[in-house]
């Protein structure tokens, strides 16, 4: 409960995490597992209550995704097991980094390709080229374009309604409307939809933005990867299979796999390599408060004449989501140019 009460969470984000957890507990019970899902003031309080009641010989858990989470698990004496939510463990990243003078994503990405075998012919890329980024910068098509297929939607049920009733009043943002799946089955359906209907045109338009579509040709799969409803290996396997079957051009397959095994895993590895000092790094000395444009009340419009910023923030309010170009090129760039304190942006 302390986690929920500690910040003003977006209503859809809080619902997504809690509903996914409760639905997973239901699925595990149906599969015959004994599940102890309890509400507690804090993770530590819930852990202590569980241990006091069940007296386990060993408590084991998948490695947390944060430095603080891992530190807490170690203090509690929890046996940690490697997470399968990343294909390159941070210890493997550290071994790759070694005493390199530079840690570039492209070098890491090529090492990952060779190690994992995606889009490879032996030790070389299948087409002789590692990177198709120069072909993946097309602007969005004009108004005559019929549009991109809408991602599947989920129907809210009693579990969803109970989660929403349990959320604190200070949550903000639009109510959940089925945009985000909260089950393994729903996440897999969205993966199949993306690979079949969207991936073929993902590459050329992966850096595009438009006011006519919030998702364009983006996968909209990152929430499921981040929470563990999908695993990076199965996502990349699906893309590899589609390429092998001739259903997806190389620029789209390579561009997507680069996002997953390249950028996503590179940033993950850098985080663990440089923590805990990384949390306080502020090389540019940015110390200004969050610009008012980033904050808004329900039903109001961000105060700005910059349509790109307004469109991105509308999407954050309506869906708790912004794709990678919106985060990097618009919202992140605005924070950089305005000298916003990194922690103010994070909170």
Please identify what each model-predicted range represents.
Residues 116-257:
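Glycine/tryptophan-enriched, flexible segments
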Residues 20-23, 46, 308:
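Well-ordered alpha-helical segments embedded in enzymatic catalytic cores
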Residues 1-40:
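N-terminal beta-strand-loop-alpha-helix module at the start
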């Amino acid at each position: 409960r302390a986690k929920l009460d500690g910040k003003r969470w977006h209503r859809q984000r809080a619902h997504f995490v809690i509903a996914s957890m409760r639905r997973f507990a239901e699925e595990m019970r149906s599969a015959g597992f004994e599940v102890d899902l309890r509400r507690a003031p804090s993770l530590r309080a819930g852990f202590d209550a569980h241990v006091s009641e069940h007296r386990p010989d060993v408590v084991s858990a998948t490695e947390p995704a944060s430095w603080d989470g891992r530190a807490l698990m170690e203090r509690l004496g929890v046996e940690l097991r490697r997470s399968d939510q990343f294909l390159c463990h941070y210890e493997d990243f550290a071994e790759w980094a070694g005493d390199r003078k530079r840690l570039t994503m492209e070098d890491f990405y090529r090492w990952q390709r060779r190690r994992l075998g995606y889009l490879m012919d032996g030790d070389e890329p299948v087409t002789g080229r590692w990177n198709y980024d120069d072909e993946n910068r097309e602007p969005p098509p004009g108004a005559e374009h019929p549009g991109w297929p809408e991602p599947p939607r989920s129907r809210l049920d009693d579990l969803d309604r109970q989660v929403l009733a349990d959320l604190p009043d200070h949550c903000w943002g639009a109510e959940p409307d089925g945009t985000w799946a909260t089950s393994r089955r729903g996440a897999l359906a969205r993966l199949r939809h993306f690979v079949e209907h969207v991936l073929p045109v993902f590459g050329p338009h992966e850096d595009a933005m438009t006011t006519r579509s919030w998702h364009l040709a983006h996968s909209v799969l990152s929430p499921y990867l981040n929470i563990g409803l999908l695993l990076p290996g199965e996502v990349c396997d699906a893309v590899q299979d589609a390429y092998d079957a001739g259903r997806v051009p190389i620029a789209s397959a390579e561009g997507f796999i680069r996002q997953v095994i390249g950028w996503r895993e590179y940033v993950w590895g850098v985080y663990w390599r440089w923590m805990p000092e990384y949390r306080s790094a502020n090389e540019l000395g940015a110390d200004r408060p969050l610009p008012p444009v980033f904050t808004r009340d329900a039903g109001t419009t961000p105060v700005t004449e910059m349509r790109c910023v307004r469109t991105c923030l509308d999407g954050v309010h309506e869906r708790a989501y912004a794709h990678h170009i919106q985060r990097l090129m618009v919202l992140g760039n605005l924070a950089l140019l305005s000298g916003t304190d990194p922690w103010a942006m994070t909170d």
